[in-house]
Amino acid sequence: MDLPGPIHDFLLVFLGSGLILGSLGVVLLTNPIYSAFSLGLVLVCISLFYILSNSHFVAAAQLLIYVGAINILILFAVMFMNGSEYYKDLNLWTVGDGITSLVCTSILVSLMTTILDTSWYGIIWTTKSNQIIEQDLIGNSQQIGIHLSTDFFLPFELISIILLVALIGAIAVARQ
């Protein structure tokens, strides 16, 4: 959107604070229904960030897929679960939780140091042909496809790995 500078900056700060507060709500709230609503707030804020950066197609896809489908599915799953099982065990930290948090923290630190120390400009993931001129493309969806397969190949693959890990975690939780 073409907004004046102060309004654009205010919206960025407002959406950023909504994103941070919503993500803290997802992690820190003990009631899973409230956590799911906080996740919906986070996803809506991300969609509004896309609107501010003139990516209307991605914003609509974000709203339809994540907020409209996945977050509602999470809410239904949480509401159909027995709520009393969340409050039976008051022991917050076990040995397994401590080991898991230590392993996850070490993986996070190693990933952050690797990402920050890598010179990403020297890595050529795919060859971009010179015949593709972005101004001649018909719509935003073609530009998104080209950027996902060339410029944003690494983040796209990292997101697919994160989704795969989340799917495996959901299966493990469902088996318990």
Swiss-Prot record:
One of its GO terms (cellular component) is chloroplast thylakoid membrane. Its main location: plastid. InterPro entries: NAD(P)H-Q_Oxidoreduct_6, NADH_UbQ/plastoQ_OxRdtase_su6, Nuo/plastoQ_OxRdtase_6_NuoJ. GO terms for molecular function: NADH dehydrogenase (ubiquinone) activity; quinone binding. NDH is composed of at least 16 different subunits, 5 of which are encoded in the nucleus. NDH shuttles electrons from NAD(P)H:plastoquinone, via FMN and iron-sulfur (Fe-S) centers, to quinones in the photosynthetic chain and possibly in a chloroplast respiratory chain. The immediate electron acceptor for the enzyme in this species is believed to be plastoquinone. Couples the redox reaction to proton translocation, and thus conserves the redox energy in a proton gradient. Belongs to the complex I subunit 6 family. This is NAD(P)H-quinone oxidoreductase subunit 6, chloroplastic.
